[in-house]
Every structure is written in C-alpha cells, then in structure tokens.
C-alpha cells in the first residue's frame, strides 16, 4: 500500500509539552532531540535509561511512571511519540492521540502515525529535513550522511549572519524580487568562504557594504591544496570544496585525472608539473601564474600531490604570495609516506620495531650528500625516501657504510595507492638489485626499517608484495 503524501512542516515546540511513550534508547534519542529545541518532554514508561533517569532527577523532563494511560493526554499535550518495543502499547497511545486529534508519531509504524520525524542535518539555526514518508528511513539517513559531509558549519554561521540583519535587509529591499536577487548575489559571493576561514569581521564588512550599496571588490586569492597520494578518495572535504570554487587550477604532474574531474567544470586547468626526465615548469613561472591570476581577481588553486608542506615547495610559494600581498590559505593533504604505507599494510611506527619516523627527499645527488647518514643508520626508526628511484644505489651504499645492517628490510612502493600499485620487498643488501630487476619507475617511495617486514602478512590492497632473488655474489 502506498502511503499518503506528507506535507513538510517545521513545528515550534518551545515550552510546549510533548508526550514520549517509552523509556528505552529510542525514546532517549527522541527526548534528546526535543530538549534541543526547548520542548517540555513528558516521559511515560515503567522504567528509564540511565540518561532519562538523570534528566528526570535534574528536572529536565517529567516522568510518568507506569504503563500508558489515556489520562496522560489531559496535560495540554501538543505531540505524542510512541517509542516502545510493545506494539499493543504503541497502538493504545496512537488510538488515544487520534481520538483527541493530536499529532502522533509511532516509531517504525507508518499506518499508526499522522506525522513522521525526518532525518535532520543541523548547522546552527539551519536545519535540513529529509523524509522518505516513513517507508524507507534508511534512504533518508543515507542522504543525511551525504549532506553532513558537504555542508560545513560555515553555512550555519551564514544563516545567523542573515538572520541578525533580517529587518535591515527587508527594509532595504521591500520588493521580494529585489530581495531574492540580493540574497542570490551574496550567496554566490565571498561571504561563506570568509566564514569558513573564521574571518567573521571581514564577512560582516562585506555584507554591510553590500547593504550600503558600496560593494567591496573581492580580491583574488591562492589556495594551496594537497590532493593526497594516488587514490582520489583520499582527497579531503575542504580540498573538494576548494576545487569546486576555483577559477584557475595549477596542478602538478602527479595529480590524477580522477581528482581533476572533481573540479568545477568551468575552471581552467593548467599543468605546472616538474619531472626529473621530462618537461618541467620553472618555479619562477609558477609564481608568475599565481600572481597573474590572483591580480585578475580569480580564485586560484595550487593543486599538489600529497601535502603542500612535505617536499612540495609550499613554503616558498607562501613566502612569495605574502611578499606580493596575495591572500592565501593552505589545505593539507595525505602525504605519500602515509598513503603508500597504509595501502601496503605497513605501520610506519610500531611499539616493537620503530619509535621514530624520518621523511627524506632524495631527488638529486646534492640532497643525498647533505644527509646525516650516521643518524639515519640508527636502528628502531623508519626511513621514507621520496623521489629516490635514481638514488637507490647511493642510498644502499651510504646506509651500509654508516652501519645500518644489510638485513634491514625495505619496501619499495611504485604507484602507491593507485590501481597499478606494486610493492617490492627485500633487504638493504638487495635494494638496488631489486629495483633494477623489476624496472622500478617513478613515482615510487622507499620505506626502510623493520616495520616493512609486516607488509608480507598485513597487505590488503592490490597484489601481494614481490621480492627479487638475491644478486649473484661477485667473484674476486
């Protein structure tokens, strides 16, 4: 049977009595929601949960101890919620409520209910209700979860900002069409972005200027965004929002097409990647592009693989932007060491094996020459080498010379956290040989330390780790 269509309605229950029949966990959740909106819950049940008992003792709720009685509805009740696990009690409460023309919700029973309690997303005064009409509540709950991740707290602050100036806005724009256009302009402007960055004073200034018809010109800005490593699912919610607000996206070579497809369709995408073997864009040219587009009033996203502040030259770019007076923000990402290790089943720290972690860049010989190899050769630490494929023979030689045991296990992770991921394992003695045997190519991350041996039985993503046979001994 198809349920009747429901009329969506928000009720003001502040200082109004609501009868909740039942004293279990479901009744507790309903009561907690009622308390949040200032209602006066009356709980009718033989016994209560610990929380309901505490609320009754502190006077937050009224308890009618016992089984449901029709007389409970003689107390100027506005709404009845039946939330027991006894169908006969729920039926009795519903019949009595219907007889007095009261709204009643019987949990998980459409036929006995004349109102449904929706799934709700709350952001301050902003409330979004989702209902399936009671027929498929899991659909409503699933959609609520999706909205929870998309709508951050700044929307609640924006709602409050507008509500505080409601009378001023209505007086300034008495015509409803003019008022609608004003709101549309402000919602598409910088207000919400400023509130998300906790810049409340600037947001208020923008709104006041708009009401005074002296709009403040929104300056361009640059957001450094970490795209994470490999799997597009590692992108953070803030990173996704930035991509959907961008006018220009300056992206690195290692950023996947899947991530770029999540960006706003109208955004211009410009590759500015660097490569050890192919075409590279100079850092000075990247600075120029950021400056040029920001000066044009555009929202620029500087999209980097991994995290902007882990071997991503993010610090240099912020110093440049600060010098030139360009507003900026930083959205961190999951760096390659964390992503690759997780997808290979390698805990970077472990109580029994490693108490410290080193992140090391090895993209050129000069980087390797400046390292303190004696410190890196110490045991009970995990080493992660970024951009080190070409330097693997040097890494092996210098660590062995510094005293790191040749039997120290390693994992070489190629295309980490991607569908093409390969994990190669061995010992320090076989490092260069293994990379050569399997023709390892960038992007690849080297993890060295006792924890890497755990990949053999903790791996969960892609194929099992591979290892090369030991190289033949040299004949002297």
Swiss-Prot record:
Pathways per UniProt: Cofactor biosynthesis; adenosylcobalamin biosynthesis; precorrin-2 from uroporphyrinogen III: step 1/1; Cofactor biosynthesis; adenosylcobalamin biosynthesis; sirohydrochlorin from precorrin-2: step 1/1; Porphyrin-containing compound metabolism; siroheme biosynthesis; precorrin-2 from uroporphyrinogen III: step 1/1; Porphyrin-containing compound metabolism; siroheme biosynthesis; siroheme from sirohydrochlorin: step 1/1
The family note in this entry says: In the N-terminal section; belongs to the precorrin-2 dehydrogenase / sirohydrochlorin ferrochelatase family.
The entry's active site is: 252 (proton acceptor), 274 (proton donor)
Binding-site positions, NAD(+)? 25-26, 46-47
> Region annotation Uroporphyrinogen-III C-methyltransferase: residue ranges?
220-476
Q: Which cysteine pairs make disulfide bonds?
A: none
Region Precorrin-2 dehydrogenase /sirohydrochlorin ferrochelatase, annotated ranges = 1-207
**GO terms for MF:** NAD binding; precorrin-2 dehydrogenase activity; sirohydrochlorin ferrochelatase activity; uroporphyrin-III C-methyltransferase activity
Q: Per its database record, what is this protein's job?
A: Then it catalyzes the NAD-dependent ring dehydrogenation of precorrin-2 to yield sirohydrochlorin. Finally, it catalyzes the ferrochelation of sirohydrochlorin to yield siroheme.
Q: Does the keyword Oxidoreductase apply?
A: yes
UniProt keyword list: Cobalamin biosynthesis, Lyase, Methyltransferase, Multifunctional enzyme, NAD, Oxidoreductase, Phosphoprotein, Porphyrin biosynthesis, S-adenosyl-L-methionine, Transferase
Q: Which organism is it from?
A: Xylella fastidiosa (strain M12)
Question: Which reactions is this enzyme annotated as catalysing?
Answer: uroporphyrinogen III + 2 S-adenosyl-L-methionine = precorrin-2 + 2 S-adenosyl-L-homocysteine + H(+); precorrin-2 + NAD(+) = sirohydrochlorin + NADH + 2 H(+); siroheme + 2 H(+) = sirohydrochlorin + Fe(2+)
Name by which UniProt lists this protein = Siroheme synthase
- Cite the NCBIfam families for this sequence: cobA_cysG_Cterm, cysG_Nterm, PRK06136.1, PRK10637.1
Gene Ontology biological process terms from the UniProt entry:
cobalamin biosynthetic process; methylation; siroheme biosynthetic process
Q: Which domain of life is it from?
A: Bacteria
């Amino acid at each position: 049977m198809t349920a009747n269509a429901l009329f969506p309605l928000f009720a003001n229950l502040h200082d109004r009595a609501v009868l909740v029949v039942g004293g279990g966990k479901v009744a507790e959740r309903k009561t907690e929601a009622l308390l949040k909106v200032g209602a006066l819950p009356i709980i009718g049940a033989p016994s209560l949960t610990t929380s309901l008992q505490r609320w009754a003792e502190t006077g937050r709720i009224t308890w009618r101890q016992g089984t449901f009685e029709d007389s409970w509805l003689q107390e100027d009740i506005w709404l009845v919620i039946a939330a027991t696990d006894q169908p006969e009690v729920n039926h009795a409460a519903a019949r009595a409520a219907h007889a007095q023309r009261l709204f009643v919700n019987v949990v998980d029973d459409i036929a006995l209910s004349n109102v449904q309690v929706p799934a709700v997303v709350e952001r301050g005064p902003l409330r979004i209700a989702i209902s399936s009409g009671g027929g498929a509540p899991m659909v409503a709950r699933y959609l609520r979860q999706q909205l929870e991740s998309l709508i951050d707290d700044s929307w609640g602050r924006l709602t409050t900002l507008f509500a505080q100036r409601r009378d001023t806005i209505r007086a300034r724009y008495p015509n409803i069409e003019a008022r609608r256009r004003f709101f549309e302009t402000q919602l598409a402007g910088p207000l919400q972005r400023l509130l998300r960055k906790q810049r409340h004073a600037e947001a208020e200034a923008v709104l006041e200027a708009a009401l005074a018809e002296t709009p403040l010109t929104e300056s361009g800005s640059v957001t450094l965004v970490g795209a994470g490593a490999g799997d597009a699912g590692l992108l953070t919610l803030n990173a996704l929002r930035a991509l959907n607000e961008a006018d220009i996206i300056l992206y690195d070579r290692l950023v996947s097409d899947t991530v770029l497809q999540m960006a706003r369709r109208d955004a211009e995408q410009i590759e500015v990647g660097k490569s050890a073997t192919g075409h590279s864009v100079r850092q000075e040219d990247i600075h120029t592009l950021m400056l040029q587009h920001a000066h044009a009033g555009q929202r620029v996203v500087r999209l980097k693989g991994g995290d902007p502040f882990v071997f991503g030259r993010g610090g240099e770019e912020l110093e440049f932007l600060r010098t030139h007076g360009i507003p900026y923000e930083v959205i961190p990402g999951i760096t390659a060491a964390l992503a690759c290790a997780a997808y290979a089943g390698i805990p970077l720290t472990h109580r029994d094996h490693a108490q410290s972690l080193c992140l090391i860049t090895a993209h050129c010989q000069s980087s390797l020459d400046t390292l303190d190899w004696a410190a890196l050769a110490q045991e009970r630490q995990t080493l992660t080498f970024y951009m080190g494929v070409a330097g693997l023979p040097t890494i092996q030689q210098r660590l062995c010379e510094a005293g790191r045991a040749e039997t120290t296990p390693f994992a070489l992770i190629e295309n980490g956290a991607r569908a093409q991921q390969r994990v190669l394992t061995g010992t320090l003695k076989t490092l260069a040989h293994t990379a050569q045997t399997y023709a390892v190519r960038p992007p690849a991350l080297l993890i060295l330390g006792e924890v890497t041996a755990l990949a053999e039985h903790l791996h969960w993503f892609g194929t099992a780790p591979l290892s090369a046979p030991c190289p033949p001994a040299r004949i002297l």
